[in-house]
Amino acid sequence: MDNNAAKPLVTVLGASGLVGTAITRELASRPIRLRLVGRRPTVVPPDARAEIEVRTLDLAVPGAVAEAIAGADAIVHLVAHISGESTWRVSSDDPIAERVNLGLVHDLVEAVRAERPARPPVVLLAGSMSQAGRSSTARIDGSEPDRPLTTYDRQKLDAELAIQAATDEGLIRGATLRLATLYTQGTDSPALDRGVVCAMMRKALADQPLTMWHDGTVKRDLVCVDDVARAFLAALDQPDATTGRSWLVGTGQATSIADLFTIISKVVAAHTGRAPVPVTSVRPAEHSMPTDLLDFVLDPTAFQDATNWAPQVSLLEGLDQLAAAMVAQTASSPA
């Protein structure tokens, strides 16, 4: 018997990004076959137990998705179109964004349809809590009707619906993890993080004031990417419990932007020995999005109950670890 073939094959699409790198680190410790697919070179963890194959592909090229997922028992789809500094700022007339954020999911479904594996593969899609749009409650719990307010969120919702339709058809065993606001604690390179936390941390390290739009009362649910990686593994391990719907993944804790920026200022000061940089309020920029001034805090209870997953990294701990990592990185960089 071919022992290699007996090991499950997990394919990670978007493995070179922030979430993909964290998931790869977790999966690499398992006795599986692991196919890492990204446009950039993917970091392979040292001392990996998994048999790792790295493929550098532009998945938007016709046929690339089919090549990437061929023979996979499970697929983690993390690819998103990045326009400038943030994935969620997408123009409604950007054909590349629609091709990547939605078209690749259609390619995935059609590739599975053509291959017709004996057992439908598990497919996990990375979504966003902001897909729900404006909520009338303090915390999003998944029962709200989806009314996405941005092009990015509409595309992510359409991708989620395509995964759901393919699951209903019996082609795949799919689920979407709608993620809270992500940040890294520096376990992997902070350069991978394009989010607001790392951006403000860099400004504080440069001794620049931290500017927030409006009065800073907007609240966010902030979750460490290492906890998110563990959430994806929990869903992979329990497909019977998670298949067929979307799940909210976060901490359930509300943090105002003013409090977040103040904490960042203080933890950076603690590591540099300088005075904390000021936190100031400015008018929202012209390129601000409808979601920028809305609260987004979620209730992750359903996912926790289904998988026994729970976040392990507190915000203060994560920010302190990130500050330490970025200070160390700055100190080791050539002058």
What are these regions (language model features)?
Residues A132-G133, T150-T151, A175-R194:
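Flexible, glycine-rich beta-alpha linker
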Residues H106-T151:
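Conserved Rossmann-fold NAD(P)-dependent oxidoreductase catalytic core, especially the SDR/UDP-sugar
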Residues R134, L149-A175, L205:
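Active-site Tyr-X1-5-Lys
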Residues D2, L9, S314-A335:
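Amphipathic terminal alpha-helices
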Residues L157, G170, L182-C198, Q208, ...:
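Glycine/proline-rich active-site loop of Rossmann-fold NAD(P)-dependent oxidoreductases
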